């Protein structure tokens, strides 16, 4: 501000900053361009709790981050707080760019499995796109036949074909029974990873990213992750969606009987404690084991 003549001294420069004039934001955008910042979410349990990003200035007070890096932070969007740090020295900037960008942190430090992968709504969208409408059991000979994938996609864009309707299409030398949704998903995949003709689930996406990391550079894998994210959100919002009914949450009939049985076991443990047969620590441990066992038992029903 002083160099550009907007303020004559430091005191006046602080006043200009407080007034948030347009010149302040122009200069801020200029100095933040191509300058990494660090985002940290407590508790920092592993190195993915602090990563570097190139900031984009927006209006509002909320920090917006890529949804695929949330797993590394163990973050969700219910008001989590994050600290912002600005590396100033050349060495710290070099470390941020070459070691701390999400591009360099695609794997989980604990076991080396991919952690920066599309999940939740993105998986829902991919699953919706790659499933078949109805029961999918039609006579294959009666299905429409297309010479290649582009013809089938064009037919869908023209409105003469539904997204999850079964069709026959020639892929290379094979004739596959598939859907336009599956074709659109495969279009974003590199040629080496095609053709996936089964419903895409969370484990499938993780497998795709694992295979991609073995074949391609990190930069190419990041582009693939972004593409899966985009088509997943498109499938979960524009094309389809999910609603939960109260009838989806039916209580298992046997649950009341199981709970009553377990409460009897816990009461027996408490009685043993009252009689001095077991210690307080043993009582807590045995009670916890009983409730964990019943939780797993109900989950398996």
Language model features: what each stretch is:
Residues 1, 47, 56-281:
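Feature marking long nucleic-acid-engaging regions of large polymerase/nuclease enzymes
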Residues 50, 118, 122, 250-251, ...:
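Charge-rich, low-complexity amphipathic helices
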Residues 26-43, 281-301:
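Gly/Pro-rich turn-and-neighbor structural signature
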Residues 1-49, 55, 69-72, 188-194:
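Extended, highly charged clamp/arch subdomains and adjacent linkers
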């Amino acid at each position: 501000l002083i160099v550009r003549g907007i303020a004559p001294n430091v005191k006046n420069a602080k006043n200009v900053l407080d007034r948030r004039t347009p010149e302040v934001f122009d200069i801020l955008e200029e100095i933040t361009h191509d300058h990494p910042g660090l985002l940290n979410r407590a508790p920092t349990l592993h190195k993915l709790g602090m990563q570097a990003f190139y900031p984009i200035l927006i209006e509002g007070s909320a920090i917006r981050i890529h949804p695929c890096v949330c797993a590394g932070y163990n973050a969700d969007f219910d008001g989590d707080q994050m600290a912002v740090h600005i590396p100033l020295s050349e060495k710290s900037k070099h470390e941020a760019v070459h070691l701390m960008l999400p591009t360099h942190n695609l794997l989980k430090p604990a076991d080396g499995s991919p952690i920066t992968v599309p999940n939740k709504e993105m998986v829902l969208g991919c699953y919706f796109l790659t499933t078949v409408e109805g029961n999918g059991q039609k006579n294959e000979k009666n299905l429409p036949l297309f010479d290649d994938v582009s013809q089938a996609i064009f037919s869908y864009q023209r409105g003469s074909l539904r997204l999850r309707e079964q069709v026959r299409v020639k892929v290379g030398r094979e004739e596959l029974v598939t859907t336009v949704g599956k074709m659109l998903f495969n279009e974003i995949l590199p040629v080496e990873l095609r053709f996936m003709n089964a419903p895409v689930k969370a484990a499938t996406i993780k497998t795709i990213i694992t295979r991609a990391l073995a074949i391609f550079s990190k930069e190419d894998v990041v582009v693939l992750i972004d593409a899966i994210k985009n088509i997943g959100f498109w499938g979960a919002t524009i094309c389809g969606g999910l609603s939960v009914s109260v009838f989806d949450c039916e209580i298992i009939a046997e649950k009341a009987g199981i709970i009553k049985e377990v409460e009897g076991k816990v009461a027996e443990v408490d009685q043993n404690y009252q009689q001095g047969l077991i210690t307080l620590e043993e009582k807590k441990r045995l009670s916890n084991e009983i409730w964990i066992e019943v939780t797993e038992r109900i989950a398996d029903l």
